Curated annotation (Swiss-Prot):
<dbReference type="Pfam" id="PF05000">
    <property type="entry name" value="RNA_pol_Rpb1_4"/>
</dbReference>
<comment type="function">
    <text>DNA-dependent RNA polymerase catalyzes the transcription of DNA into RNA using the four ribonucleoside triphosphates as substrates.</text>
</comment>
<keyword id="KW-0808">Transferase</keyword>
<keyword id="KW-0862">Zinc</keyword>
<dbReference type="GO" id="GO:0003899">
    <property type="term" value="F:DNA-directed RNA polymerase activity"/>
</dbReference>
<dbReference type="GO" id="GO:0006351">
    <property type="term" value="P:DNA-templated transcription"/>
</dbReference>
<dbReference type="Pfam" id="PF04983">
    <property type="entry name" value="RNA_pol_Rpb1_3"/>
</dbReference>
<keyword id="KW-0240">DNA-directed RNA polymerase</keyword>
<feature type="binding site">
    <location>
        <position position="327"/>
    </location>
    <ligand>
        <name>Zn(2+)</name>
    </ligand>
</feature>
<feature type="binding site">
    <location>
        <position position="317"/>
    </location>
    <ligand>
        <name>Zn(2+)</name>
    </ligand>
</feature>
<keyword id="KW-0479">Metal-binding</keyword>
<dbReference type="InterPro" id="IPR012756">
    <property type="entry name" value="DNA-dir_RpoC2_beta_pp"/>
</dbReference>
<dbReference type="InterPro" id="IPR038120">
    <property type="entry name" value="Rpb1_funnel_sf"/>
</dbReference>
<dbReference type="InterPro" id="IPR007066">
    <property type="entry name" value="RNA_pol_Rpb1_3"/>
</dbReference>
<feature type="region of interest" description="Disordered">
    <location>
        <begin position="1318"/>
        <end position="1342"/>
    </location>
</feature>
<feature type="binding site">
    <location>
        <position position="250"/>
    </location>
    <ligand>
        <name>Zn(2+)</name>
    </ligand>
</feature>
<dbReference type="InterPro" id="IPR045867">
    <property type="entry name" value="DNA-dir_RpoC_beta_prime"/>
</dbReference>
Length: 1364
């Protein structure tokens, strides 16, 4: 510290000071010199760095840590600069072991393929084995990569970065220098062709394409993920936003138990408070109730071997609508007990929502089950295997197709050595797989058993895979498949295999026969190349004239004209105008018909061919249609084509002009009711066509329509007459009186109108149109065939409008149309009529319209291309222009044999004619000569390696066709293994082509983590979705009894409960039972596999506890069990993706989901049945009932998903701002709800301070407690919140340090007092003024002090003293 003018000290003083300083320095540095800082010579990687920073933060606080982190950063950069770690292609060193590893994998896979080819394993087993082999190889390769770098290049830059955790990870290094590995296709199934190369060696084209599948998937995933994750966070924030720490201690005795995983608690206890004493096995008390558990205490508890600790948790906190400090524990931001007013709900929501982006969306289905060689025990000695007397085993086939035995009970297996030595004992657990038989002699180091890990029954799903045929031929089953017919609910018959067995396809050349082809050769006959095997013919159905069209592509069209009709009375004329060509029909009398169809098009029955262009029925403007009595129309389904006239008569037409405007009213240029002349501008740029009275229709200052009605306007005062014609108006016949002195001589339509001059009658002219009974048309001929379809034309009159219809239009309309319609009889629905233009037979210049019905026959050209059809040869049997009768052959097609051989025909039945035939060619058989007498018989089927004679194995697969003394003739074939319950697509003896499906294998594969993983799984849990096909849960505890149903498929599980009642649970097909006979089960336990329905689980728990406990306790325990389940499930998803979230965050959210109950029976309370209400509220209500003696309410706990919970909060403002705004606000308004503004969201929306942090109302009590002599400074605050800035500037309130939340209010300093005195002109020397002198310790005034009235007034003005 320096002063402005240092004085020179005396020498003695200086010496003394120096000595003292030296002593002080020694005093400080002595401990340092004795204990030098620990020198640790370790590699500091990412993990060690993490721990170092955490330790520093805990012991030395933020400032020291941040400066240390800075120093570390500088250090790192300094050495990184000097080391210059770079990466180049040469750094990617592929381990030499890769070649051998891939070689081994290839060998295993070749062996598997060979087993598949010989029909020893099914397609599924082959696929599973291939994938597992590659997965294992990949893992071994990663180890080789690590070993290679570690031993040969520990300072390799790639390895250093990945190994220290600075950048990249092992899976990326694996792809750079190991192998890229297996990829999934877009459906999520793994492709069994792995990418063997790495990026260093480069990918082949095929590998590149497969590789880009995965990359695309990743990109799409990321895009979807961000959106989903954001929405999840929003819902979480909404459900938890009002959870604020409002109390210090709720005093609850309830708690949750945290159990150690593998005798470790990791971080699960840190930051929690104990709910009871923690006592070690020796009886030593490690912690009292309400002790904060820090890492040291946590590891102490672990070391003491304690496996379960009771801690306080937000789940069991009894604070009303909030959480208390002790139940919440540490705020993880600064590792100290959470402060009052901390918005822990929002923190929880963000903590769970934020890692959402790191979770994957969808997972891959691995083909089959990834059976890592887990728990495999090998023999240590050579000897004989003994199972022992207790052993029970059943045959089992592993997913890789290895025959083994599965243990049904726990027992001990012994291997008795053949020589000296101790026997090897292996403990076999239920469900383990044994690869040896009882009494079998084995060598040492042989796989004996695979021990089942934990629960055997995993969640599995049914999946299917097709077996595709590799060669054409004939199918034969082995007897042991035992196919049986199964009829499903729809009545479809399918064939199912009952046992494991082979299906053989014996080779041959299979010919597909076209429809209607018949074989012309007999079975077992020998055919030569080019011989006709079958013949098909195409026939005409109706007969007629043949037209041959030019061929298109590989087929020719033969058209047979069945019926034709030419309209002789009409000329066909063509006109063209700007919109294209128009065709007209002109009759002899000159009337013209407009053609609706152009020549070359097709039309169907009942369609309009032409319309009469008739101006007699055209009006000048729009108007009103009235039918005179006698005119009748047919009812039409739609008015699109108008209404057909039944009976002629008179049609009356009242013209009026209607302008549809839809413009602003300011453009109107006339007034309503005014009489205007033709040509008047009614609206800007719109002119009236006729004269008459104007009616203006408007709505909301928008002009809709302007109607001009012409006629004779008479202003009269006869009220009776005016009333008579009010509204729609009436028709008046000639000679009738309309009003006094007004009569009409022609028919008029009379209406009352209001004009600016007053009321009057408008006599509107009526036009009459006479409509004939029949359409006037020239004679039209019907054309009939002796048999088959025939044609006709009929004329109809159609009115466009019905009686009393108003036509709003300025232009005129056509009232009546005369149409020519096509009529066809005896046609099939597919038949259409072609419209053609034909020259007249006599005068070539005149064209006529011709209607034709054609039968079209497509004739295939000769094809060589389609191998399965053999070569076909087609002959046309007709020529152009000749006439054929119905049933005549038009073309024949022959199927020719491609290669000599022996024909075999399958059995033909009435229902199923022969569709295929097979020719057994010379190359489909092989003859093997044997040295001795063959040991096989005709009809035996052999595979590679089977003995044909002693010491002579077969080198191919097939069926023995002939045997003589020294040779065996085999018909080549291929076996396919079929697993039980597979669907067989073909029957014994069927012929198949290469590529046909033979069977559908049904197999079970393990569900990869419920398939749903990551975000969708989190969402499913937090929204409490009811899963499809959920598992069957046990309702009451008891003993299991498994029963077979009527047929061997169906099972039922009975649970014998404690009171000997029997709970029956029928099990659906395809469900796996997860319990064993005689097993004890508890409520809520799974009886079958499948996802759990959380709502059902809660019901099971509640029913079970309700039978033994009071309602309140039952509800709390049921909820507690479910809460524990939910927290664990959510944690599991995040853990599986490597994200760590503290339990307490999830607990806060789950607490909000389980806080409500549904009232079932209100009792004497004011609650409503069906109402959702907080458990605490019901508890209070029921306690009040217990005191007054009323009937308490009955309720059941409910689980709400986060969306539902958000919409069911007490605050309607918060709910409405979340979703379904209108519904929430409407309901709140109807119920007259009040919002108490307890949460953060409501206050933000209203615009007040949020009740968290310093705005939290709990602060005021703290302040009041500490305000000491000046309680009034806190009194006047309109907002009801104690804001810091509201305290007067003369006083300072120190914000409490984070550790304790007690507020301190310092007394005013001398300077402050001085300032206030000066402001109020108070004489400082007058010691009697109590207001500005300091009170004594007890806030009592000394006797000599008197209160100065002026000073008090001044203080009251300042608001520093209350009026009391």
């Amino acid at each position: 510290m320096t002063t402005s003018k240092p004085r020179k000290p005396s020498k003695a003083k200086a010496a003394k000071a120096a000595k003292a300083a030296k002593a002080a320095l020694e005093k400080i540095s002595k401990p340092l010199s004795k204990t030098p800082p620990p020198f640790r010579n370790h590699i500091i990687d990412k993990k060690a760095l993490k721990n170092l920073v955490a330790w520093s933060f805990k012991h030395h606080g933020t400032a020291v840590t941040s400066s240390m982190a800075d120093d570390l950063k500088d250090l790192g950069f300094k050495y990184a600069t000097q080391a210059a770690v770079s990466i180049s292609v040469d750094d990617l060193k592929v381990p030499a072991a890769k070649k051998d590893l891939l070689g081994q994998a290839e060998e295993q896979i070749t062996a598997t393929e060979e087993r598949y080819r010989l029909g020893e394993i099914t397609e599924v087993e082959r696929h599973t084995k291939v994938i597992d082999t590659w997965t294992e190889t990949n893992e071994r390769l990663v180890d080789a990569v690590k070993k290679n770098f570690d031993e040969n290049a520990p300072l390799n830059s790639v390895w250093m970065m990945a190994n220290s955790g600075a950048r990249g990870n092992m899976s990326q290094v694996r792809q750079l220098v190991g192998m890229r590995g297996l990829m999934a296709n877009p459906q999520g199934e793994i492709i069994d062709l792995p990418i063997r190369t790495n990026f260093r060696e480069g990918l082949t084209v095929t590998e590149y394409v497969i590789s880009s599948y995965g990359a695309r998937k990743g990109l799409v995933d990321t895009a979807l993920r961000t959106a989903d994750s954001g929405y999840l966070t929003r819902r979480l924030v909404d459900v938890a936003q009002d959870v604020i720490v409002r109390e210090d201690d709720c005093g609850t005795m309830r708690h949750i138990v945290v159990e150690a995983e593998d005798s470790k608690f990791a971080k699960r206890l840190v930051g929690r408070l104990t709910a009871a004493q923690v006592v070690s096995a020796e009886g030593e008390v490690l912690a009292e109730r309400d002790t904060e558990i820090d890492p040291a205490l946590s590891s102490k508890i672990e070391k003491a071997g304690i496996t379960a600790v009771s801690i306080r948790s937000p789940l069991t906190c009894e604070a009303n609508r909030s959480v208390c400090r002790k139940c919440y524990g540490w705020a993880l931001a600064h590792n100290e007990l959470v402060d009052l007013g901390e918005a822990v709900g929002i923190i929880a929501a963000q903590s769970i929502g934020e890692p959402g982006t790191q979770l994957t969306m969808r997972t891959f289905h691995t083909g089959g089950v990834s059976t890592a060689e887990s728990g495999v025990v090998r023999s240590k000695v050579a000897g004989d295997v003994e199972f022992g007397s207790k052993a029970r085993v059943r045959p089992y086939r592993t997913p890789h197709g290895v025959e083994a035995q599965q243990a049904e009970v726990d027992f001990t297996l012994t291997i008795k050595p053949s020589g000296k030595g101790r026997p090897q004992k292996i403990d076999i657990t239920l469900g383990s797989l044994l690869f040896v038989d009882n009494g079998q002699a084995i060598e040492s180091d042989v796989t004996v058993v695979q021990i089942a890990a934990g629960a055997v029954q995993k969640s599995v799903e049914k999946a299917t895979k097709d077996v595709i045929c590799d060669l054409a031929g004939q199918v034969h089953y082995e007897d042991k498949i035992q196919p049986r017919e199964v009829t499903d609910r729809q009545g479809n018959i399918t064939l199912k295999a009952q046992r494991l067995g082979r299906m053989w396809v014996l080779a041959g050349d299979v010919y597909n026969l076209p429809p209607n082809a018949l074989p012309v050769v007999d079975g077992k006959s020998t055919v030569t190349e080019g011989q006709v095997l079958a013949e098909a013919s195409q026939r005409s159905e109706f007969g007629g004239d043949v037209r041959l069209r030019d061929s298109i592509g590989d087929s020719r069209e033969v058209q047979i004209v069945t019926t034709a009709m030419t309209l002789k009375d009409f000329k066909l004329l063509e006109e063209s105008n700007h919109s294209g060509e128009l065709w007209n029909l002109e009759a002899k009398d000159g009337t013209r018909y407009r053609l609706n169809t152009i020549p070359g098009s097709k039309i169907g029955n009942g369609e309009v061919i032409a319309e009469l262009a008739d101006d007699r029925f055209r009006t000048g403007t729009g108007g009103l249609v009235k039918f005179a009595p006698g005119l009748a129309i047919k009812k039409a389904r739609s008015a699109k084509n108008g209404y057909e006239v039944n009976k002629g008569g008179t049609l009356l037409w009242v013209p009026q002009e209607t302008h549809e405007i839809n413009k602003d009213i300011s453009l109107l240029m006339i007034t309503d009711g005014q009489w205007i002349e033709a040509g008047t501008e009614v609206v800007k740029d719109i002119f009236s066509q006729t004269a008459g009275v104007v009616t203006v229709t408007q709505k909301n200052d928008i002009l809709r329509e302007i109607i001009v009605r012409g006629g004779d306007l008479r202003l009269i005062s006869d009220n009776k007459a005016l009333e008579r014609f009010e509204g729609d108006g009436q028709m008046v016949n000639p000679g009738d009186d309309v009003a006094k002195g007004v009569s009409v001589d022609t028919m008029k339509f009379v209406q009352t109108v209001e004009t600016p001059e007053g009321k009057g009658l408008l006599l509107r002219p009526v036009e009459e149109y006479t409509i004939p009974n029949e359409a006037q048309l020239p004679e039209l001929s019907h054309l009939k065939q002796a048999n088959g379809p025939h044609l006709g034309i009929k004329a109809t009159q159609r009115l466009a409008f019905k009686d009393n219809e108003l036509i709003k239009s300025v232009e005129g309309v056509e009232l009546l149309k005369t149409q020519l319609l096509l009529e066809t009889f005896d046609t099939t629905p597919q038949m259409t009529v072609d419209v053609e233009r034909a020259p007249d037979k006599r005068a070539k210049t005149i064209s006529r319209l011709r209607l034709v019905i054609l039968e079209s026959i497509l004739v295939r050209r000769d094809t060589m291309s389609d191998s399965s059809h053999g070569s076909t040869h087609t002959d046309l049997q007709v020529e152009d222009g000749i006439s054929v009768k119905a049933g005549d052959v038009v073309a024949t097609t022959q199927i020719l044999c491609k290669q000599e051989g022996v024909v075999q025909l399958p059995e033909a039945t009435e229902a199923e004619p022969v569709r295929r035939l097979i020719v057994e060619r010379p190359e489909d058989t092989t003859t093997i000569s044997t040295s001795g007498k063959p040991s096989v018989a005709v009809g035996d089927r052999v595979v590679d390696g089977d003995l044909l004679a002693s010491g002579q194995p077969s080198d191919c697969c097939g069926e023995v066709e002939a045997v003589d003394g020294s040779s065996v003739t085999l018909r080549l074939g291929r076996p396919y293994m079929v697993s039980p319950d597979s669907l067989l697509h073909v029957r014994d003896g069927d012929l198949v082509q290469r590529g046909d499906g033979l069977a559908l294998l049904v197999f079970e594969r393990q569900k990869t983590g419920d398939i749903v993983q990551g975000l969708p799984r989190i969402e499913e849990l937090l929204e409490a979705r009811r899963p499809r096909d959920s598992a069957i849960l046990c309702r009451k505890p008891g003993t299991v009894e498994i029963k077979q149903g009527e047929d061997d498929d169906s099972l039922s599980v009975n649970v014998i409960e404690s009171d000997d009642a029997i709970g029956e649970y029928p099990i659906l097909l395809g469900r796996n039972v997860m319990v064993n006979d005689g097993q004890q089960v508890t409520a809520g336990e799974l009886l079958t596999d499948g996802p759990i329905n959380p709502h059902e689980l809660l019901e099971c728990f509640f029913e079970d506890f309700r039978s033994r406990k009071p309602l309140m306790d039952a509800a709390q325990e049921a909820i507690a069990n479910l809460q524990h389940r939910l927290v664990t499930e959510v944690q599991n998803v995040y853990k599986s993706q490597g994200v760590s979230i503290d339990d307490k965050h999830i607990e806060v959210i789950v607490r909000q989901m389980t806080s409500k109950v549904r009232v079932e029976d209100a009792g004497d309370t004011t609650l409503l049945p069906g109402e959702l209400i907080e458990l605490r509220q019901v508890e209070d209500t029921n306690q009040a009932m217990a005191i007054t003696g009323g009937a308490p309410s009955e309720f059941t706990p409910v689980l709400l998903g986060i969306t539902k919970a958000s919409l069911n909060t007490d605050s309607f403002i918060s709910a409405a701002s979340f979703q379904e705004t209108t519904r929430v606000l409407t309901e709140a308004a109807i119920e007259g709800k009040s919002d108490w503004l307890r949460g953060l969201k409501e206050n933000v929306i209203i615009g007040r301070l949020i009740p968290a942090g310093t705005g939290f109302s709990g602060f005021e009590e703290e302040l009041q407690k500490e305000a000491g002599p000046h309680p009034d400074i806190l009194s006047e605050d309109p907002a009801g919140y104690r804001r810091m800035q509201n305290l007067r500037p003369d006083y300072t309130v120190d914000m409490p340090p984070a550790a304790s939340s007690s507020a301190l209010l310092a007394d005013p300093s001398d300077a402050d007092l001085e300032a206030t005195r000066t402001r109020h002109n108070i004489d400082p020397s007058a010691s009697t003024n109590a207001a500005f002198t300091r009170p004594d310790v007890d806030n009592e005034l000394k006797e000599e002090q008197v209160v100065d009235a002026e000073a008090v007034e001044g203080l009251q003005e300042e608001g520093l003293l209350s009026d009391d």
